[in-house]
Amino acid sequence: GTGGDGMNTLNISTASALLLSSMGVKVAKHGNKAVSSKCGSGDVLEALNIKIDLEPNDIETQINKNNFGFMFAPNYHSAMKFVGPTRKKIGKRTIFNLIGPLSSPALVKRQIVGVFDKKLLKIFANALKNLGIKYAWIVNSEDGLDEISPYAKTHIIQLKENKISEISIDPKKLNVNADKFENLIGDDAKFNADKIINIFKGEDNDFSKAVCLNAAAGLIVNENHINFADAYNNAREHILSSKAIKHLEKVQNGWKCSWKNNSKEKFKDKKFKK
């Protein structure tokens, strides 16, 4: 998503991406470290002991093996390395917040994009259409999140087979029963990572519900489900079963095996001087 909603929430989209991967959906997440918030996707993944700067072939291996790969934006868009410090100093959203979701190196055909302003919904839908995206949801909630909210209605523009339509998700109709927005406020990378670990172990709270709502969107766009309520209930059942924590451990350990094997392949024909 664009980020820049100013809410400083927990890493909902990153957690939902990991949850989706534990449910068998292949996810190529494109992200960065924090710019206008305390903790970006790159920060929380590092705090979860997931390596974020793998080579493209290693990322592909991880997606094929564990259904999850993270593409660290500065590694793929070299100019961003020079822009990054200035963005951090500004501390507010800029045009680069809008560019990020449109520049995935994975060239995906299915995508969930959260935007910080409802006015951007159709703009992004048309941009993704021009980029050849097959199926996408662009989301913005009435309480200001660039995510599907567990507290308020979320407005969605759906792009499917070049057709654009409007839909909405109302958590009240889904009996989400989330408590209060303050329960989604995040902090530093360790704090946010611990929250992800807790819900993956089966802890039931507002964060878990928010993650399941956004994972449900992924199940719809991946065409695992056609009914959002069924997708949400499936995600809830899965996360409460603690299956996600076992998968997280595989993702944490997967890059080590990938790097080790790749290193052997790179150096097996080379001779080193003593």
Where are these predicted regions, by residue range?
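Active-site cofactor/substrate anionic-group-binding motifs, chiefly glycine-
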Residues: 1-35
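Glycine-rich anion-binding loops and their surrounding alpha/beta cores
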Residues: 5, 9, 24, 46-53, ...
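Short linear Ser/Thr-Pro motifs
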Residues: 11-13, 37, 41, 149
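Short, surface-exposed recognition loops or helix-turn segments adjacent to catalytic cores
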Residues: 30-33, 55-63
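Active-site-proximal loop->helix
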Residues: 33-51
